């Protein structure tokens, strides 16, 4: 057992001897990554950096699936229990270095998340959340209306019974990040087979095979990072990975020249009326706004223009700079959501040459999942940090 980057890992015996060889004669590991969303793209890039012979396959373009629908709030604020909170916090802390390594601007911006309540019940909930986050060592300031106005003077918040500011949180443009990962991986020698449908995944005695676009592709390891498609992909290899259906709706605006927020990256505002969802907002790299409602797990299917117009009008009540912007509806997106809500990461005992990488909060978790998956595939490590998230829990 030894430590790497603060993570305890164990070497284990495997029939796949190429894992264990060292020095100049070490065999190059062949890996096929199915899925070029933010998680799959990050894994492909990380593997390519370690010298693996990587082939990435996606039925569409990089970052064009659930990744493109993500609100892309990088955080550990809304994560429970503490073990999962810490898992997300570790990945949050990796984003700066990860993004810089890509060599292009992927819209990574820090500034924190600001949220406020307008009722006594809402204030109690925020106060309780702030206390819990601080107990876990996560900076979270409890604010009154005056302090909130100092941080974001351009808001029109109406009633403020309490507010919290989580300064570590940030945002990124996940499609740009996925595209940059694939481009970087290709520069390192990876092959990208895009707009190519996978029709079979097979585990062999010492390898794994993918059939895609009529072509049979053999590899030492196949990584399944297909998001909502992972349940079907895993079943091809005899692995059970159940997911909940998790539709979500966000809207965008056209580019807005002026900054909508003075300091923070992400804004969460209370409902304007009892029984209506809360509103969340961020301004994208191109100046457009992305707006959603409810929590990041809320289910929504209304992607009509009427809904987009109404949601923008509600957001503009709190953010006057939005007035006059045009609402652009985005088709409903389906988010990866393992049945118990937690990541599914690792080799499956049922198909030991198939590696699963599935999670909600993929934008926050992509750097960490990429690092740990690479360690387990290239170094034959068993990472203790992943022990709660193994595919075998669904067997």
PLM-predicted stretches and their roles:
Residues 310, 316-395:
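C-terminal catalytic lobe of FAD-dependent flavoproteins
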Residues 1-31, 49:
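Extreme N-terminal leader/targeting segments of oxidoreductases
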Residues 71-151, 278, 300, 306, ...:
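Dinucleotide-binding Rossmann-like beta1-alpha1 core, especially the glycine-rich loop
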Residues 106-117, 141-145, 149-188, 294-298, ...:
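Helix-loop-beta segment of a Rossmann-like dinucleotide-binding subdomain
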Residues 45-49, 72-74, 105-108, 216, ...:
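Active-site substrate-recognition segment that forms the wall
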């Amino acid at each position: 057992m030894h430590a790497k980057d603060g993570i305890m890992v164990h070497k284990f015996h495997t029939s796949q001897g190429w894992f264990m060889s060292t020095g100049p004669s070490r065999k190059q590991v062949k890996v096929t990554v199915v899925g070029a969303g933010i998680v799959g793209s990050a894994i492909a890039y990380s593997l390519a950096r370690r010298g693996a012979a990587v082939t990435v396959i996606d039925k569409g373009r990089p970052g064009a699936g659930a990744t493109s629908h993500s609100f892309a709030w990088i955080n550990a604020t809304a994560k429970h229990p503490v073990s999962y909170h810490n898992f997300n916090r570790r990945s949050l802390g990796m984003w700066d270095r990860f993004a810089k390594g890509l060599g292009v601007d992927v819209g990574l911006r820090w500034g924190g998340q600001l949220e406020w309540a307008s009722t006594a019940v809402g204030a109690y909930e925020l106060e309780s959340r702030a206390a819990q986050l601080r107990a876990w060592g996560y900076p979270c300031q409890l604010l009154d209306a005056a302090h909130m106005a100092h941080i974001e003077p351009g808001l029109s918040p109406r009633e403020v019974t309490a507010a919290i500011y989580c300064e570590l949180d940030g945002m990124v443009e996940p499609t740009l990040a996925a595209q940059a990962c694939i481009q970087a991986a290709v520069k390192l020698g990876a092959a990208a087979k895009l707009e190519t449908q996978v029709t079979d995944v097979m585990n062999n005695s010492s390898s794994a095979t993918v059939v895609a676009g009529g072509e049979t592709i053999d590899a030492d390891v196949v990584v399944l990072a297909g998001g909502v498609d992972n349940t079907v992909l895993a079943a091809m290899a005899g692995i059970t990975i159940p997911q909940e259906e998790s539709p979500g709706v966000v809207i965008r605006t056209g580019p807005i020249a002026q900054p909508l927020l003075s300091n923070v990256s992400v804004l969460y505002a209370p409902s304007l009326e009892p029984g209506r969802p809360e509103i969340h907002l961020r301004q994208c790299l191109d100046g457009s706004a992305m707006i959603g409602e409810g929590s990041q797990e809320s289910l929504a299917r209304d992607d009509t223009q009427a809904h987009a117009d109404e949601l923008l009008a509600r957001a503009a009540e709190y953010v006057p700079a939005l007035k006059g912007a045009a609402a652009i509806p985005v088709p409903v997106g389906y988010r990866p959501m393992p049945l118990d809500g937690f990541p599914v990461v690792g080799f499956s005992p049922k198909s030991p040459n198939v590696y699963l990488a599935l999670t909600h909060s993929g934008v926050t978790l992509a750097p960490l999942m990429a690092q740990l998956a690479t360690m387990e595939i290239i170094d034959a490590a068993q990472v203790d940090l992943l022990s709660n998230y193994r595919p075998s829990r669904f067997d």
